[in-house]
Curated annotation (Swiss-Prot):
Pathway: Amino-acid biosynthesis; L-lysine biosynthesis via DAP pathway; DL-2,6-diaminopimelate from LL-2,6-diaminopimelate: step 1/1. Homodimer. Its EC number is 5.1.1.7. Keywords: Amino-acid biosynthesis, Cytoplasm, Isomerase, Lysine biosynthesis. Belongs to the diaminopimelate epimerase family. This is Diaminopimelate epimerase. The gene is dapF. The lineage of its organism: Bacteria, Pseudomonadati, Pseudomonadota, Alphaproteobacteria, Hyphomicrobiales.
């Protein structure tokens, strides 16, 4: 067995996260190790946030994001808050800058324990999301579920927060839709060459949304931070809301602000559950401590 790596089992509004400390190591978390951890009820996760040594000058760490199916993800807002909470507890510092596959992100822990992450700038071009077909206006694209004359879901807004998102707007309860059925089909629709995160969202007021998400590579989730950001900017872009909204998710609420400089700021909590050690090659693990940090 290889030398074990430290990890913290955490959650961001119920979005199950493993923060893996891979600093000082040359190896990576292998897909089969991720799948093994995800299949264990004690360590089941939506994303692994693997903290590596910095590769880019001016950043503290490189963060690799791994889905529960072993695939690599470009963004995970809830996971970034968990990383910040752990590193802030370790270093006593409130602010950090990270490199991810999607670019550089900055984050800060506030005195009240909430954590803000600058998720960067959204992208709306069809090639940037990406889509398999050209759409000049991605505020609403041609895509539907159900009969042509009476679709169940249709005309989503699409956007990228470093990862692709489709947001279906509804006027009734987002929980009344069978997302467990529609989610996999839409995630893997040919229009999305890199697959997509699928969200059903309702506008409650000009300052509030309610939504739920089928997460690419992870499935139904209690919270998806990048999806909340994508829904918030899409709501503002289509005139449904202002640029600052409260987003209600199954696991709780996030505050999303689309600033005038085009950066999207996500604010919410992170919670530690227990710590342990694991083998990044196989996923074998052992528990060390548990309880609230």
């Amino acid at each position: 067995m290889a030398e074990l790596a430290q990890f913290a089992k955490m959650n961001g509004l119920g979005n199950a996260i493993i923060v893996a400390d891979m600093r000082g190591r040359a190896d990576r978390v292998r897909p089969e190790a991720a799948q093994r951890l995800a299949s264990d009820p004690a360590t089941h996760f939506d994303q692994i946030m693997a903290i590596h040594d910095p590769r880019l000058e001016g950043t503290e760490n490189y963060i690799e994001i791994i889905n529960s199916d072993g695939s690599v993800a470009q963004a995970c807002g809830n996971g970034m808050r968990c990383v910040v909470q752990r590193l802030a507890a370790e270093t006593g510092r409130p602010s950090f800058t990270f490199e991810t596959i999607a670019g550089v992100l900055s984050a800060e822990e506030h005195a009240n324990g909430l954590i803000s992450v600058d998720m960067g700038k959204p992208r709306f071009g069809w090639q940037d999301i990406p889509l398999a077909e050209e759409f000049h206006d991605t505020r609403k694209i041609e895509l539907q579920v159900g009969p042509i004359d009476k679709p169940v879901l249709h005309s989503p807004s699409v956007a990228s927060m470093g990862n692709p998102h489709a947001i279906f707007w509804v006027e009734d309860d987002p929980y009344s839709y069978d997302l467990e059925r529609f989610g996999p089909m839409l995630e893997n629709h040919p229009i999305f060459p890199e697959r997509a995160n699928i969200t059903i969202a309702r506008v409650d007021s000009p300052e509030e949304l309610t939504m739920r998400t089928w997460e690419r590579g992870a499935g139904l989730t209690l919270a998806c931070g990048s999806a909340a950001c994508a829904a918030a900017v899409s709501a503002a872009r289509t005139g449904r809301t202002g640029r600052g909204v409260k987003v209600n998710l199954p696991g709780g609420s996030l505050e999303i602000l689309w600033r005038d400089d085009d950066h999207v700021i996500m604010t919410g909590p992170a919670e530690w559950e227990f710590s342990g050690r694991f083998d990044p090659a196989t996923g074998a693990w052992e528990r060390e401590t548990e309880g609230a940090a």
